[in-house]
């Protein structure tokens, strides 16, 4: 009977996953500290641009977390999640910031317009298309963040691929939609801080849901 090597059993793999998640969570919190300032602001429309500015570091941090968890090891003797996170941050910070800032800009403008619907002279039916645009932009952002975190493409190529894959991989889009609903539900039921503490688990869920997207990009758009 063959014996399992140390660190190769199911308990060891579970322990490795927990270790990876805890380390990545700690690094996520550390690299998004400026964003915590937004939690101290009043929830008023006038503060939305400042909230968006505080949230800018979140994009590169999420990208680094995606990179680290994608390259995570399951062997207890070969766990280096911190090194993978820092490498992902260094490689992808610029691309992730472009994706994140572009999305934040769209969402901030939409949120301000919706909050000032009457003052802006917009009709009530404007809410529905605005929400659809916001949902589509969020689907695009999640795809773009995964692509720019795991592949080396130019921003314009990432933007086009992300939009194309929203339609090409409907299962991924539906899963991402459910993930966004979970996040919004968590924020409404508790607070942004509680959701942030589950950041690494949510990133792992996004990565798991994006397996089909990653496979399509690797097979059809890389050599």
Predicted regions and their residues:
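Helix-coil boundary and N-terminal low-complexity module in membrane systems
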Residues: 1-111, 122-124, 140-142, 147-180, ...
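Membrane-interface helix-capping segments at transmembrane helix termini in multi-pass transporters
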Residues: 114-128
